């Protein structure tokens, strides 16, 4: 039990020692770029392939029927994409 407590205390201290300190700007810059990834609001959304999802046209199979499942361009799925309205 004592070893477990010592291990937890050591890992907690290690986390605080290795945490990123924004005041250490020269230490976090590597060849003109940041060592750590940029904040979400600084990222380029056009660089992400996940933001470019194609939708399925009307009369094509869309899977399990859910309304607004995100697969159909119209938003209506009943095994095939149905027109909106």
Curated annotation (Swiss-Prot):
Signal peptide location: 1-19
Record's keyword annotation contains Mitochondrion: no
Residues forming coiled coils: none
Modification after translation, per record: Is not hydroxylated.
Cystine residue pairs: 55-73, 62-77, 72-81
GO MF term (any one): toxin activity
Record key words, sorted: Amidation, Calcium channel impairing toxin, Disulfide bond, Ion channel impairing toxin, Knottin, Secreted, Signal, Toxin, Voltage-gated calcium channel impairing toxin
Prosegment residue ranges: 20-53
Localization, UniProt: Secreted
Entry comment describing in which tissues the protein is expressed: Expressed by the venom duct.
Residue numbers carrying Glutamine amide: 84
Organism superkingdom: Eukaryota
Gene Ontology cellular component terms for the protein in this record: extracellular region
Family listed: Belongs to the conotoxin O1 family.
Free-text function comment from the UniProt entry: Omega-conotoxins act at presynaptic membranes, they bind and block voltage-gated calcium channels (Cav).
Protein name stated in the entry: Omega-conotoxin-like Am6.5
